[in-house]
UniProtKB/Swiss-Prot annotation:
Record-level GO BP terms: translation
InterPro entries with a match to the protein in the record: Ribosomal_uL14, Ribosomal_uL14_bac-type, Ribosomal_uL14_CS, Ribosomal_uL14_sf
The organism of origin for this protein: Nautilia profundicola (strain ATCC BAA-1463 / DSM 18972 / AmH)
Name listed for the protein in its UniProt record: Large ribosomal subunit protein uL14
Record keyword Lyase present: no
Entry keyword Protein transport: no
Gene: rplN
Length: 122
């Protein structure tokens, strides 16, 4: 469950290391985002030679949350951290590698490229 001012790890090699959620996209009064949702975020920590710089406003898709997500079959899945992958206007990832496992729900939301780059899909 991600809301404004939540800080997330960046799970790709775009150059950003930590982002802070500014807005959850999808509805005027939408409060929370879960796995597979798109957020607008500000970059709080970044590598000095990366594509993304500190202070930049980016869009990102959430790939891991500490709050459990219920699946269609009734099972629950949760992760150790909150993480996101930075995307461009065409919903393609900016980075070329994804670090750590991602939830299967990301594929169902239409992010096949992110799923194919991930080392493990749970």
């Amino acid at each position: 469950m991600i809301q404004p001012f939540t800080r997330l790890k960046v799970a790709d090699n775009s150059g950003a290391k930590e982002i802070m959620c500014i807005k959850v996209l999808g509805g005027s009064k939408r409060r929370y985002a879960s796995v597979g949702d798109i957020i607008v975020a500000s970059v709080k920590k970044a590598l000095p030679n990366g594509k993304i710089k500190k202070g930049q406003v980016v869009k990102a898709v959430i790939v891991r949350t500490k709050k459990e997500v219920q699946r269609e079959n009734g099972s629950l899945i949760r992760f150790d951290d909150n993480a996101a992958v930075i995307i461009d206007a065409k919903k393609e990832p900016i980075g070329t590698r994804i670090f750590g496992p991602i939830a299967r729900e990301v594929r169902y939301e239409g992010f096949q490229k992110i799923t194919s780059l991930a080392p493990e899909v749970l």
